[in-house]
Regions:
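Glycine-/Pro-rich loop/turn segments that contact NAD(P) or position catalytic residues
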Residues: 87-187, 227
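Active-site-lining helix/loop region of Rossmann-like oxidoreductase modules
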Residues: 17, 152-296, 300-303, 314, ...
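N-terminal Rossmann-fold cofactor-binding loop
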Residues: 41-45, 63-64
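Conserved Rossmann-fold cofactor-binding substructure of NAD(P)-dependent oxidoreductases
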Residues: 61-77, 83-89
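C-terminal helical cap and adjacent loop that interface with cofactors, partners, or active-site loops
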Residues: 279-359
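Short, conserved SAM-binding/catalytic segment
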Residues: 50-57
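Conserved beta-strand positions in the Rossmann-like core of class I SAM-dependent methyltransferases
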Residues: 39-40, 106
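N-terminal Rossmann NAD(P)H-binding glycine-rich loop of SDR-like oxidoreductase domains
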Residues: 14-34
C-alpha cells in the first residue's frame, strides 16, 4: 500500500539536470510534449543554450563540483530529476545540494551502491522535509511496482524472484553502458534473510516464461535486490535477465578479471567500447517483458508479468515523468523512498502501452 502523501507548498517546477545527455534530452522533449516546463541544467553551456532555445525552456549552467553554482541552480524549484550518470560519482553532490535547499531528489540511477548511500540519509532527509527517491526510471519503477503488486496478492511471501527481457533492435543508452562497466567490480548481489550480500554462485541460470515459452535467464544485480526489500519487506530476493550467448561469455571473462576491474584505468579502457544509443526508430521496434514470482515456502505462490516499451529510454522517460508529475502536485513523503512505497503498485500502469497479466 502506498504511503500517505503529504502536501507541499513549494514551487511547481523542477530542474532537469543532465538535460543534454542521451536520456536527458529525450526527457526534455517529452516534458514539452506533456506541457511540463522544467529548467534544463548541466555543465555544457553551448549544448544547453541550443536545446533550451529549441524547446523554449529556461536553462542554468552548473557543474556538480561547484556547490555555489549548484545551490543557485536549485533556487525556485521543488524537485530535481537527475539524469547525469554514472550516479556512483554524480549522485552525492546533487543529494547534498537538495538537502541544503529543501528540494526533493529524483534520479534515474540503477546502481545499488547509490541506493545504499541515499538510504543512509533517510533521517537527515526526514528532518529537512525532503524526499529522496533514486531509481525512478525502468530501474526500478516497473519491477518495484510488480513486487508490491505480488506482495499484495501473497502477503505471506518470503521469496521474490524477478526477471526481464528486451526483444527488438534497441540497445542500451551510452550512460547505462558506462554504469554497467562501473558496477562490474562489485559482483552479483542477492538478498538473503534480509541481508544484502554477494551471490554465492557465479552465472546462476534458470528458466522463465515471459509469455511465449520458457527461456533461459541469468542472475544479475538489478536495483530491486536492494529496493524491493524496503518496498515489500520480502527477505529473499533474486533477479535475472536474458543475455545473448556473447554477453554470457563476456560476463564469465569479467568474473575472472574482477579484481582488475577495481582499477580505474581498466574501466576507462572498457568505456572506450561504449556505443551510441539506439535511435528512435530502433526503440519503437523494441518491447520489454518483466516477470515476477513470490512464494512463501509453504505452498503459496503468485506470479505476474508486465509488458511495455523499450526500457532504457522510452519506459524510463515514462516512469520518471509519472513520478515528477506527482511530486509537482505535492504528493511526496519525506525521507528515503522507493517509487512504489509512495505511489503504489499501479504507478507503472499509468505509463502508456504497459499491460499486466497474472500467471
Amino acid at each position: 500500500m502506498a504511503h500517505e502523501a503529504i502536501a507541499s507548498r513549494m514551487p511547481t517546477t523542477f530542474l532537469l539536470y543532465g538535460a543534454t545527455g542521451f536520456v536527458g534530452e529525450a526527457m526534455a522533449r517529452e516534458c514539452v510534449r506533456r506541457g511540463l516546463a522544467p529548467i534544463l541544467a548541466g555543465r555544457n553551456a553551448a549544448a544547453l543554450a541550443a536545446l533550451s532555445g529549441e524547446l523554449g525552456l529556461a536553462h542554468r549552467v552548473c557543474a556538480l563540483d561547484e556547490a555555489r553554482a549548484l545551490d543557485a541552480a536549485l533556487v525556485g524549484v521543488s524537485a530535481v530529476l537527475h539524469c547525469a550518470g554514472p550516479f556512483l560519482y554524480t549522485s552525492r553532490p546533487m543529494v547534498d545540494a537538495c538537502l541544503r535547499a529543501g528540494v526533493h531528489y529524483l534520479d534515474i540511477s540503477g546502481e545499488f551502491p547509490v541506493f545504499e548511500a541515499v538510504a543512509a540519509r533517510d533521517a537527515e532527509a526526514k528532518q529537512r522535509g525532503v524526499m529522496l527517491m533514486p531509481a525512478v526510471g525502468f530501474d526500478v519503477v516497473p519491477t518495484d511496482c510488480l513486487a508490491v503488486y505480488l506482495k499484495q496478492r501473497l502477503p505471506s511471501a518470503t521469496q521474490l524472484t524477478m526477471a526481464f527481457q528486451s526483444v527488438g533492435p534497441g540497445g542500451l543508452p551510452p550512460g547505462t553502458q558506462r554504469t554497467v562497466i562501473e558496477l562490474l567490480s562489485f559482483g552479483n548481489r542477492v538478498r538473503v534473510n534480509g541481508r544484502f550480500e554477494r551471490a554465492t554462485s557465479a552465472m546462476k541460470t534458470r528458466s522463465v516464461n515471459f509469455g511465449v515459452g520458457p527461456v533461459e535467464v541469468t542472475q544479475l544485480t538489478w536495483g530491486d535486490v536492494f529496493t524491493a526489500y524496503y518496498s515489500t519487506g520480502i527477505p529473499n530476493i533474486e533477479e535475472y535477465t536474458v543475455l545473448p550467448k556473447a554477453a554470457r561469455q563476456s560476463m564469465t571473462v569479467m568474473r575472472v578479471l574482477q579484481p582488475l576491474l577495481a582499477l580505474r584505468f581498466v574501466r576507462a579502457l572498457l568505456r572506450r567500447g561504449v556505443k551510441p544509443g539506439p535511435s528512435a526508430s530502433r526503440r519503437a521496434q523494441t518491447v520489454t517483458h518483466v516477470w515476477g514470482e513470490v512464494t512463501d515456502g509453504v505452498g503459496g505462490r503468485a506470479a505476474a508479468r508486465l509488458h511495455g516499451p523499450e526500457a532504457g529510454v522510452e519506459w524510463t522517460v515514462a516512469c520518471a515523468l509519472a513520478v515528477v508529475e506527482r511530486v509537482l502536485r505535492g504528493e511526496v513523503q519525506a525521507g528515503y523512498q522507493t517509487p512504489a512505497m509512495v505511489y503504489g503498485s499501479e504507478l507503472v500502469m499509468t505509463c502508456v502501452g504497459v499491460t499486466r497479466e497474472d500467471v
